[in-house]
Swiss-Prot record:
Any one GO MF annotation of this record: heme binding
Protein family according to the UniProt entry: Belongs to the cytochrome P450 family.
GO biological process: small molecule biosynthetic process; terpenoid biosynthetic process
Protein name in the entry: Sesterfisheric acid synthase
Cofactor: heme
Protein species of origin: Neosartorya fischeri (strain ATCC 1020 / DSM 3700 / CBS 544.65 / FGSC A1164 / JCM 1740 / NRRL 181 / WB 181) (Aspergillus fischerianus)
Reaction catalysis annotation: sesterfisherol + 3 reduced [NADPH--hemoprotein reductase] + 3 O2 = sesterfisherate + 3 oxidized [NADPH--hemoprotein reductase] + 4 H2O + 4 H(+)
One term under GO cellular component: membrane
Amino acid sequence: MDAQHLMTMSGISLEQVAIMGCSLGTGLLVSMIIYNYFFHPLARVPGPCTGAIFPFWSMSSLYRRRLNPDLAELHKKYGQILSLLSGYGGLLMCPRNTGPIVRVGPNQLSFATVEAQKMIYNAKPTHTGSDELFGRDGTLQDVLLSMILGAANIGSLSNRAEHKKMRKRLQPGFTSKALFEQESLLRMHMDRLLQGLAQDTGVIDLTEYFSRFLWDLIGDLSFGEPLVPEKHGRRTDTLRSLVGVYQGCFPILEAINYAVPQIEGVLKLALQLVPPATLRAVLPSATFREYDHPAINSHTTPLQCCINRQDGRSDFLTHIMGDKSSNPTELELSYDELHSNATVLMIAGYKTTETSLSALFYRLLSTPGVLEKLQTELFSNFQSIDEITGKKLLSLPYLNGCVNESLRLTPAVAGKFASRRSPGAIIEGFYVPSGTEVYTETYTMQRSPQYWHAPDEYRPERWFERGEGSPYAQDVHEAFKPFSSGPRACLGREMALQTLRLTAALLVYRFHLKIVNEDRFVWEQDTDSRMIYSKYHIKAIVQERLT
């Protein structure tokens, strides 16, 4: 007896079943909206209505690729009214220029204060047995990162103890001693960049030059040799397959993460069930394994050559592997784990540094008077370009001010993608229930008038003119967190800063630079902003100085 016959016997038609189903679905939807907007534990936190009932606000912002400016505007909007802070003891009303807390999703809060930054990212583990006070477990972005890379790495490990162990293994590659040892490698790639710029004529796209330079440099440091020479024509395609897949899924992930909270567990289980060989064949990161070593045979990858190498060279990967000559058992990571870590260092180091370098030269060339002051500082300290070293550049206040100020205005990674899960804690006077996704919005905090004088203006002198009577005396430098903070802060911070300082110093010392901006490009208006920036270009006329 089929279902239709049963319904006929009971006097219920298919049309009535459909109507009842639609009514039930509508009722559940209305109930969810009413609960999220009026009765949810986060209902008293200010924020857009479209964010309270469903993650429509985040989905829209990510789809339109305007995440950083949209979040800044959101915090500003809710800072113009009396920002509502709720704690155990009742309600506290306080006026601020920038709303300290905004509800951007049904179960998601964005903060923009130093206090929240410390609480979320620097808090020590609790005595309750959880991994950490604010953990990464349960964030769908981390699961997706694991899927893309296919093995445990410094970026995807959510367990605090395991992450600490991995970070300790990688840390020797990023110490001051390691940076000094790696400077010759940096200068080798830098010389190629300078030579290419010197030979080019007309209007030059600096961003494209920076992209090639950093791809070769970071690939050399991560895999033991530059990946994908330009003649292969596959450098851009490779990165797009890795980063594009990740970013393109963001709007959908926002909906899935809310509608199916258990999706992370399902994906983690799937990763365990799928054979590693199958994952390697289908994941975008598999393309890194296809590159041939030019000196050996077509079946030997750069990573394997680096593992086999005995020349004592210092790079990221040799520190990951440890000193095999003195302790053969030190190589505790599998090939897949080595590859996964090298890949994540490659992706993170390349794209973020390229963004920061392009943003730095955009500020240098488009802000009146800045380039001239930097030139004066460099020529007064160095008689020739050969005298310029990373160590000497540390003592130049204006150069370091230029770098820091660019990072303040343009942090490479959006704060949303360093989100954590609350274990149930009070942040900014508001009790944040367990499981709530929280993060500090770096872009907003680093442009907040609460912490900075003239927050939207590029003023390198704010970093060294801080004496009595200075307009920058009250600037709060604790609000400067372009590399995040705490145990998961960017491992390559010092390497990135050294690359930015050296590139700026060498280019400004050797060349006359003049921006060409016929299309009136403005960084804040014309770049795409999601997890990272995209669609930016810095065009300039570059002429070698007469010596």
